[in-house]
């Protein structure tokens, strides 16, 4: 062997042995009990909470000094329902040696097994995870300043040095106020840092949803402590998998002190489903608010939910998010294919001017704008056009048991509203929506999937519908103008079946969802008895609970016609039928408005 190489190996082994002996010698002076007390006091200074260790504590010397403790708990805030915010079956801390010799604790790695976290908010929206230590009283400000400063320096050094966090078999219980707790399982979480990068591996299970996040980012630790203090630039290269479907997240984030962050992010996927994301967003939206806020209490009796939308999750930033998803699953709907858009963020506004997707063989394009989303009444505007698809295509892909054939469909919308919930948005809405459906055959299962309102309308139009499993539709058109949440219908909703011409008139108040709709079905032959049974029916109640009532005006008109018919030998009845044929023989054509007046991509 080369002499120089031998000397190098001997020197290396000697250094390694010296370091090992030094570590053993230093560790021999470390008492686990005293170290436990030091850890508890450090956590107390950093968080204001009590750290208790009731199980055995062991000390390992190689490859680094580590303390392993069992049956560990961190106390909760005074108002929380559970006495402990965190409990651990086992926790392991890798501790830096030289700071320890000076009487301070710097942790480089935390490993946790069997973590149970009890997270909770109170009535004012404050979370128990706020670990800001209490401010000491009884001393002058001049005296407090240096003491607190020294304490903060010690506290910061304890946690800034953490490079790795490993969590196995964790359970997180989140309780919003007095509501039932949501249980989230965390089989694995690993955060590591090296060479200015952070590696992430996360597995989460919530109800029937599973989430996996893995990849690399710029240093999360550096970004956390440098945010708004010095320039931060982070690269993103992550894969988010929800229920087996993966979304690639790539891009960068740039943050300069006292300036809104900027970003350029790309989201790409062959197939992705929004249902799990919506469920996790609902939990994150409740758990994410650290500052006190006025609770938003849903009413629970509206068709359009009064549950607050997660506007608070939207970032105040300047940037771009490009989305390209080959197949996007939508809860309760047929999947969208070739879904593409570019989201433009500018402070508290978001615009998507190029949203496009396919449904079945049809296509859709839309423009969406959200303005002032950080305020009490964000403004939302949506307009778009969907065409060249059919009910048959949608039903075949969404529910194979509900059969339909044909039904070429065309939809255009141009709506604006404001508020924090769907109910507020529609209750203050202005604009118009138009739907046109061509010739097709609909079975009863398809109609029943339309909900209580649709079923009530069909039953009122045709009381014999339940005896037949199919409705032959010639056409249907609904032109619905909205003025401050009020929809007024006057021959702007019409339909034709193989037997009937149908028009609707009346109003829908979206603010309270009250219905006041008269149904006017006419036999195509015009050979009626003069008693229009459909004209006697009015849809009342609400969108959530529609009811078929009596149209008193229709009763009077029919009674007058019948009475005059007896007096005139049926002449008045024939005249009324002729008038009906002349004015309502083309209800779809009468209701249909120009598509370009509703939506134009150039507007």
Where are these regions (language model features)?
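Generic short beta-strand segments
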Residues: 70-75, 115, 168-173, 324-328, ...
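Secondary-structure transition motifs
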Residues: 49, 70-189, 258-316, 440-468, ...
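Short loop/turn motifs that connect adjacent beta-strands in outer-membrane beta-barrel proteins
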Residues: 100-104, 376, 422-427
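Amphipathic hydrophobic-ligand
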Residues: 49-52, 78-95, 107, 178-193, ...
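Elongated, acidic membrane-bridging lipid-handling scaffolds
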Residues: 19, 136-233, 300-345, 473, ...
